[in-house]
Amino acid sequence: MHGWNRLTAFLLFVVAIPAAADCSRGGTAPIADLRAGVVAENGSVTVDGIVTGVFLGRNRLGGFYLQDDRQPPSGLFVYAPRLGPGNLRPGQRVQVEGRFVRFHGRPQVSRIDTIRDCGYAGRAEPVAVRLPEDAGRLDALQGVKVRFPDALTVTGNYELGRYGSLRLSSGGRLLRTGAPGSGANAHADRQIVLDDGSYRAEPDPIPYLDAQGTRRLGDTVQGLTGILTHAFGAHRLHPTREPSFIAANPRPEPPPAAPAPLRVSTLNVENYFLTLGQRGARSQAELQRQRGKLAAVVRGLDADVLALTEVENRREALTDLVRQINRGLPQGQRYAAVAHPDSGTDAIQVALLYRPERLDLVMTAADVDPVHNRAPVLGWFRASAGGPLLGVAAVHFKAKVGCPDTGDIDRGQGCWNRLRTNQARSLLEWIDSLRRDGAPVVIAGDINAYAAEDPLDLLRAAGKTNLAGRDLRPSGRYTYVFHGEAGQLDYLLAAPAVAKRVTAAGVWHINADEPPFLGYSGRRPASGPWRSSDHDPVWVDLHWR
């Protein structure tokens, strides 16, 4: 921001703006002309208008917004960081003399010489905006007081703890369920960022939290009113009235107790590392929090078989995780790890846990095809009381990150899509080669592909069914959120013969909807299972006798 003349700054800071000043002098520049570039930059200007938003004081924007009374209105930011917050109020007409500049492309008046109080003119009526809206119209309303009369849904909270902002959308939250690459423009037109009247990092207190200290995705807000602007690549609203949220997506209860003999679940442990300072915990305190969170998740899932992803590829890490989980469990509910025949050389591995009091482990195998960077592991299980075999294969396909410049680049399904598709093909061939007496196999884990992408198309073509899909509405079929879009990356997949035995299934939305600062390494880690990972666990109950 641009500095002030020291004497002027001192006077404005100490002395209130004079009331009933003479504002009749001519030569004022229309705000619309300033915004349109008619007036040269870095020159002295005089503007007048009605104060619509005051963002003065410590850790605020350091200024206020003016708006003219034309139709359509035009608005402008006045940068006045030394002006006390009690000197201005919305509805006040003022005349400002200063320097016209553009800050990061946004027009504003700074280096203030004089601010005159021209009396109270009444609060400006907000301009109604309904999403989806064309970006051109939103650009024309920058600096203007607006109101969103419709309900908006919280669809992104990644930057809430970092910058005090939420991503909102019209028509419900943004879902990644369609064909690859579809809906991108429509999603862009449906979004607005709710900011907090500042651009400071790590705000304290964190705004917009509920009584539980969270703000979950899926919550709603209606009648949002404030000043529209564009910064950091997005249209943003700085509210002039405190937003009132509705907890439309409350924290869910654990999956109900399973009446069926067998429950299988996925569980992403978000880099459970004993080696501190690597991908996982940075300190012993963070590791202890991570252990507590994961133990709470396992207790809530109450699964007989758990397919884990993102465990440090060290035997000691898996052993420690199992020990920590078992500490709070009674004897008949404790877990044992399936020994991975060949976990490969990647920094992380997949793993299988099971309850030996309820299940017998018959055989294990690993898919050592070099196409896999994390070798899948398969365990064949039979109920301790007897019954048919069931295989569970823990998998973790290549992520959509670390993209190459050429080759397997992003063509609408994220980079490495071709590799993930080849991993799916290899997995199917490997499972088919291991079939024991026609026993089916449940593929469990992180495919890193959305439901309509090539790897899932290939798995479906081979007869694999999304076991949790039957019991979930489309709006609930997600396990991960990226850039405000929710989609399913984690699956339990099996043949129709297994799907017929499903008695209940679901996704336990304990992670993806929660802000990251509640995680084990966050600014305000929550107790219990909340934000124990960035992926939600998927579970299924099977009538398997």
What is each model feature region?
Residues 71-73, 84-85, 101-104, 199-201, ...:
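Solvent-exposed loop/turn segments at secondary-structure junctions
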Residues 317-398:
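Structured beta-strand-rich core segments of catalytic domains in phosphoester-bond hydrolases
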Residues 386-388, 394-417:
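Active-site His/acidic residue clusters
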